[in-house]
Regions:
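Non-heme Fe(II)/2-oxoglutarate
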Residues: 1-82, 99
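Catalytic core of non-heme Fe(II) oxygenases with the double-stranded beta-helix
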Residues: 79-169, 173-188
C-alpha cells in the first residue's frame, strides 16, 4: 500500500504499510499483559463477535520504532501535525461473523489520531468486502465521502480520531492492533 492522504484538514486518512508488523504479534501473548488488562472489554465497545483487550502502555514494547514511523508517514503527506503522547492501545480479534459498528475514537475538541495495523489478510474474494474496513469522511461542507479498504497483513491506516469508521463482518478470524496518540498542530 503506497502512503497517501485522503481527505482535508477537517478529516483525513493516511493509507500506508508497516513492514515490521511481526512486532505486534508479540502482544497477542497474554503473558505480556499486566493482569488488569486481561479482561475482554468488547461489551463496552462497538465490537461484535470478537474480543477486545486493552494493553497497558508499559507493555508496549515497540513504541520507540512505531511512533517515528507514524510521524514519518504524516510528514510525507504534508499534514502539519506533531504526534505527542500515547493515549491508549488495544488489540481486537474478530471471530467468524465478527464486525464493528461505525464509531469514533474521539470528540472534535480532542486532538487525537488513531493508527490501525492489520495483522491478518482480508478475505481474498475480490467481489466482497468481508473483513474490510469502512470509513466516512466529512469535508466540512456537508459532503460525505465513503471509503472501503481490503487491507492485507501489515497495512496501516492512520486517521484523525473523529473519522467515523468500522469493519465489515469477517468470514475467518481477523486481528488488528490499534494505537491512539495525542497530537498538536505544527505552525510554520
Amino acid at each position: 500500500m503506497k502512503t497517501h492522504l485522503l481527505g482535508n484538514q477537517h478529516q483525513w486518512i493516511i493509507e500506508s504499510h508497516y513492514e515490521d508488523k511481526e512486532e505486534f504479534d508479540f502482544h497477542w501473548d497474554k503473558k505480556v499483559f499486566p493482569s488488569e488488562t486481561r479482561e475482554d472489554v468488547s461489551d463496552q465497545t462497538s465490537t461484535y463477535r470478537g474480543k477486545q483487550f486493552n494493553i497497558h502502555p508499559d507493555a508496549y514494547v515497540n513504541e520507540w520504532k512505531f511512533k517515528p514511523h507514524l510521524q514519518e508517514q504524516i510528514d510525507k503527506v504534508g499534514l502539519p501535525i506533531q504526534i505527542t503522547d500515547l493515549c491508549a492501545l488495544w488489540i481486537i480479534e474478530y471471530k467468524k461473523g465478527g464486525w464493528q459498528k461505525a464509531h469514533r475514537h474521539s470528540d472534535p475538541n480532542v486532538k487525537k489520531l488513531s493508527a490501525v495495523v492489520y495483522l491478518t489478510d482480508a478475505d481474498p474474494d475480490p467481489t466482497t468486502f468481508h473483513g474490510g474496513t469502512f470509513a466516512y469522511l466529512y469535508d466540512g461542507e456537508g459532503n460525505t465521502h465513503d471509503l472501503c479498504y481490503k487491507p492485507n497483513r501489515g497495512d496501516l491506516l492512520i486517521f484523525k480520531s473523529t473519522v467515523l469508521h468500522g469493519s465489515y463482518p469477517v468470514r475467518e478470524s481477523k486481528k488488528v492492533f490499534v494505537v491512539d496518540y495525542f497530537y498538536e498542530d505544527k505552525y510554520v
